[in-house]
Amino acid sequence: MLYLQERKKICIMLDSFSLASDFVGCFREFLYMLGKYVRVRVTKPMHFFDKEKNISYDLNFGNVESGIDALSPVKGAYIMGVTHRVRVFEGRVIAIIKRKDLGGIILVVAPKSKRYIVHQIEDAVEFAEKRGTYDINCLYESSCGAIVYRIINGETRFLLIKNKRSANWGFPKGHMERGENEKETAYREVLEEAGIRIRFLPDFRFRSEYSIQGRIEKQVVIFLATTDDTTTIIQREEIEEYLWLKFDKAMNSLKFPNDKQMLRKAHEYLLNAGVTNG
């Protein structure tokens, strides 16, 4: 069966490879459903009042008719990105909800053109799914961070950190939290992970997109910042090590092409601004 084959494939894949540094998975055997296109037959349209549960539906909800194996434990699907009642909807699975006290899972489906991250989905299903009563995995993730530099003994040095969940050097970054904008997330993450306060340089914003093991579609936004703080205090629970390196050594320490491209752009920016001469 497709469900059993895909489930086995995902479990083997995740056992064989480490995920990106800030990706946390749950009920990994269902990850194969993320990104799939399904057809939903709506049984509880938007604004429907469920007398038994005493709730009014803020989203269309229904049964998944096609796109997944009949043996899968899917009990239904919420539809996001649609602001009116529909009878049938075809869209992409953007999240999987596993209720802690009930069997089976619930999908969250949206149009291909719509992108929602975890806290947006949590807010949308709050009318029926109370936070803390379920686990959730999402197709889309958004992280923000910063390339931080400072002048040490007359030389420009860049901050690299190594996360305990990754063997690779990178920049401080993390998931956006509810109510934050991109710069607020980047500021908080640098402060949490490195213990330093930063100032953002204007007109530098680098966005990259990639997938984690072909299942999670991630967007990362990186800013350029500097600091007057001279003491780096890493978050020991998450960060293993840090370094302040000159440009060439920092480039050699980075593994991923996206990170190298970001640092190269940041270095060019500083050269053009006359902040550094090498």
Which residues does each predicted region cover?
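Unchanged
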Residues: 174-261
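N-terminal first-folded block
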Residues: 45-51, 143-144, 168-171, 175-178
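Short, acidic/hydrophobic/Gly-rich beta-strand patch recurrent on exposed beta strands
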Residues: 159-163
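Conserved N-terminal beta-strand and adjoining loop/helix that marks the start
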Residues: 135-158
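Hydrophobic N-terminal alpha-helices or hydrophobic patches in metabolic proteins across all domains
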Residues: 17-139
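Polybasic, lysine-rich low-complexity intrinsically disordered segments
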Residues: 8-10
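Charged phosphate-binding loop/patch that engages nucleotide di/tri-phosphates or the phosphate backbone
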Residues: 128-138, 252, 258-278
